Amino acid sequence: MQTIIRVEKLAKTFNQHQALHAVDLNIHHSEMVALLGPSGSGKSTLLRHLSGLITGDKSAGSHIELLGRTVQREGRLARDIRKSRANTGYIFQQFNLVNRLSVLENVLIGALGSTPFWRTCFSWFTGEQKQRALQALTRVGMVHFAHQRVSTLSGGQQQRVAIARALMQQAKVILADEPIASLDPESARIVMDTLRDINQNDGITVVVTLHQVDYALRYCERIVALRQGHVFYDGSSQLFDNERFDHLYRSINRIEENAKAA
């Protein structure tokens, strides 16, 4: 099975607090993987390293590779990092859209990497690009909002626009950081349904950080759980049972309660 993301000996320290401890991880083509863990476990930190949004510690042997290209090595970004990022779609909890632009214009931003620079200066997109953007919006059920300002949309609708932008980008990997954290249950279901549809029908690798264990079990075949910066569990979601859940979450809660009591 083709390895899409490879992480070796990744460590990260913030202000003398070690957030990640020598993490090793391989993610394969067409997988949909949930990163789970309590707050502060390192799951979002790990996700942001995968495309070089942040760099790890300068640890000997640390290395991240995406789609066969080095993203970072021993705390330094690769010189051709833009090529890796061009193949990666991002979906963040805070949506990361341009509020003053229309839905269609936000989706067209996904084509900037494949558009001549002089065209991007004037937002001159081809008819073919606009058609692809509309097709992407149709795919996520948002084409009727194409000419509406993105600032008028609900949180769930904005997340679907972000997914359409990743489709427009023709991303081979989608990294989603808490995409349903602030959404109501129905909007969360629609967003996760959309991500799973893209994963299953397009073969796009999806890595998503989640707080909601039930969504991870329902939508992702594989779970990677982090606990205090270490990989606690890496395997089938079907084998992530109540005992593992208890060790992952409740033991952390007991540690925090004991610390407060002290």
UniProtKB/Swiss-Prot annotation:
Source organism superkingdom: Bacteria
Disulfide bonds: none
Membrane topology designation: Peripheral membrane protein
Domain ABC transporter as annotated: residue spans: 5-253
A Pfam cross-reference name: ABC_tran
Catalytic activity, reaction form: phosphonate(out) + ATP + H2O = phosphonate(in) + ADP + phosphate + H(+)
PROSITE patterns, alphabetized: ABC_TRANSPORTER_1, ABC_TRANSPORTER_2, PHNC
GO molecular function, one term: ATP binding
Binding site for ATP: 37-44
Protein keywords: ATP-binding, Cell inner membrane, Cell membrane, Membrane, Nucleotide-binding, Phosphonate transport, Translocase, Transport
Localization in the cell: Cell inner membrane
InterPro entries, alphabetized: AAA+_ATPase, ABC_transporter-like_ATP-bd, ABC_transporter-like_CS, ABC_transpr_PhnC, MetN_ABC_transporter-like, P-loop_NTPase
UniProt entry tagged with the keyword Transcription: no
A cellular component annotation (GO) from this entry: plasma membrane
The EC number(s) this enzyme carries: 7.3.2.2
Statement: the UniProt record of this protein carries the keyword Cell membrane: yes
Enzyme class, broadest EC rank: translocase
Quaternary organization: The complex is composed of two ATP-binding proteins (PhnC), two transmembrane proteins (PhnE) and a solute-binding protein (PhnD).
Family the UniProt entry places it in: Belongs to the ABC transporter superfamily. Phosphonates importer (TC 3.A.1.9.1) family.
Function: Part of the ABC transporter complex PhnCDE involved in phosphonates import. Responsible for energy coupling to the transport system.
Stated name of the protein: Phosphonates import ATP-binding protein PhnC
Species of origin: Shigella flexneri
Encoding gene (name): phnC
